[in-house]
Amino acid sequence: SRNMGTQQATSVRQLLRFKIKPSWLVAWILPVAIVLLTIFVNSLLPNCEFNTDMSSLIPVDQVTEEQKEMLGMMMNPTFLIVTTIISGLFAGATINALFAFGAEYGWRNFLVDALREKKFVFASIFIGIVWGLWHFPLILLGHNYPQHSVAGVFMMVIFCVLASFVELYFVLKAKSVYPAAIFHGTINAVAGLNVLLIKGGNDLLNGACGLSGFIVITIVIA
């Protein structure tokens, strides 16, 4: 509950310092755990279930029997989960982190410096609200919540507030903005697993940006 300025000295120069620490590894692995737990929680919600049948993803009229057999193996849930996690971890720490860095430089660098004297909880909520509202034009156009674009604006704000607690913790722990970019990039890379592995529900319930994700991230924060 202390002010961020007294809890950690976080100058702009420090936040941009590239010095790998154990917290970077946690920020890299945690998104995978969040997504996998979200899938589990999602499967327990009403009218939702774990999807093990990926056959609908195979364009049967466009492939040979041999290709169909190979695609069937690739669409095995275990194979899909493992390959998505491996590729997601790689992308999350490289190209995705690079793209996420632009946003994180603003949210977890400029705003953190501006809110230095505020308490951690206040800063997390404030940054999360600003970050969430920044998405509202895309959300109204159907991004993330195509079935509920108006309600989706509020859902995105909630997600961003929750994610801000996690990301700001990493920024202050490592005194660097890079773990936030890695967390952001990795969760974007592996979040698609939920779409493939959950049948039923809707965009307000499913995935990291839905109720199931909110439950998991709240547990992580607690």
Regions found by a protein language model. Name each.
Residues 128-150:
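Membrane-helix boundary elements
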Residues 28, 89, 93, 97, ...:
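Residue-level signature of the transmembrane alpha-helical core
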Residues 67-96, 207-215:
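Hydrophobic alpha-helical transmembrane segments
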Residues 32-37, 129-137, 185-196:
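Aromatic-anchored segments of alpha-helical transmembrane domains
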Residues 25-48, 168-184:
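Hydrophobic alpha-helical membrane-insertion segments
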Residues 149-151, 183-222:
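C-terminal membrane module of polytopic membrane proteins
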Residues 1-29, 41-61, 99, 222:
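Membrane-helix interface linkers and caps
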Residues 101-128, 172-176:
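Membrane-interface helix/loop boundary segments of multi-pass membrane proteins
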